[in-house]
Amino acid sequence: MRGEASRIADRESRDSLAPKLRDTREDAWRIGNELFTITKVLDDSIQLERALTDPSRPVADKVAVLTELLGDNVHPMTMEIMTDLVSRHWSRARDIANAVEDFGVDAMMYYADATGATLQVSVELSELHSALLNLPVVRAKLYDYQATSEARVKLFREVFSGKTLNKVTMRLAEHATCNLRRRRYLETIQWMINKFSRHMGESMVTVTTATPLKKEQIKRLVEVYSAKVGRQVHINSVVDPTVLGGMRIQVGDEVTDNTVVAQLQNLHRKVQTEATPA
């Protein structure tokens, strides 16, 4: 969890630079890739993270480190983002890498916007999440720290080679396994799904069922929950074969569980309560 200073630094930096990053349009693809690469470099060097976040070090010195590291090899917007980040205060040195990754995903979202693929990528990430729930062995290998990042990416490509995924979906999914960042693979994919949902101005409604939802069911759920929360919602359909009947629906912290298992558990609690002597 990030400290207060890091949360403020991340939010203010992204809020201030979002319009410029959005305006890069197709160039955002290059910027996002560069930021993912920088995230990996930072993760691999705590010394570099400390050099770029040391509060006692002048900002000019930190920018000099950036210039030596990146030179003229990156997009000007990438350099502007990094310069802004090193000028801010961070609770922990490693939090700057988190902020760089945030910007990387933002850049990919803006590229998706520019190419009219935002909704497609959001849906594909949700479908990918559901597919991997049913592939526990593959899922485990995608965040296997004993394997090389190259091996994990190769596995992902082999498993999903038959899918015609948008290149943004592919890049985000590969980033999630290439640079694990102390997270399980599906945690990263879910984080990206949530970011896309917020980006599109929607609320995320996660619906877990034993079999895929039909289009009519998704349409009805969108209508019901859009009316309930007062804004458009996105249905994140999760398929979990272990679910017995019904649906488990989560909106933020609110969970509605009408699966058979949940109903049996509620019945069991009710019986126990009634059987308890007064």
UniProtKB/Swiss-Prot annotation:
It comes from the Bacteria. PROSITE patterns: ATPASE_DELTA. One of its GO terms (molecular function) is proton-transporting ATP synthase activity, rotational mechanism. Keywords: ATP synthesis, Cell membrane, CF(1), Hydrogen ion transport, Ion transport, Membrane, Transport. InterPro entries: ATPase_OSCP/d_CS, ATPase_OSCP/dsu. One of its GO terms (cellular component) is proton-transporting ATP synthase complex. Signal peptide: none annotated. It is found in: Cell membrane. It is a peripheral membrane protein. F-type ATPases have 2 components, F(1) - the catalytic core - and F(0) - the membrane proton channel. F(1) has five subunits: alpha(3), beta(3), gamma(1), delta(1), epsilon(1). F(0) has three main subunits: a(1), b(2) and c(10-14). The alpha and beta chains form an alternating ring which encloses part of the gamma chain. F(1) is attached to F(0) by a central stalk formed by the gamma and epsilon chains, while a peripheral stalk is formed by the delta and b chains. F(1)F(0) ATP synthase produces ATP from ADP in the presence of a proton or sodium gradient. F-type ATPases consist of two structural domains, F(1) containing the extramembraneous catalytic core and F(0) containing the membrane proton channel, linked together by a central stalk and a peripheral stalk. During catalysis, ATP synthesis in the catalytic domain of F(1) is coupled via a rotary mechanism of the central stalk subunits to proton translocation. This protein is part of the stalk that links CF(0) to CF(1). It either transmits conformational changes from CF(0) to CF(1) or is implicated in proton conduction. NCBIfam families: PRK13430.1. Belongs to the ATPase delta chain family. This is ATP synthase subunit delta. It comes from Bifidobacterium longum subsp. infantis (strain ATCC 15697 / DSM 20088 / JCM 1222 / NCTC 11817 / S12).
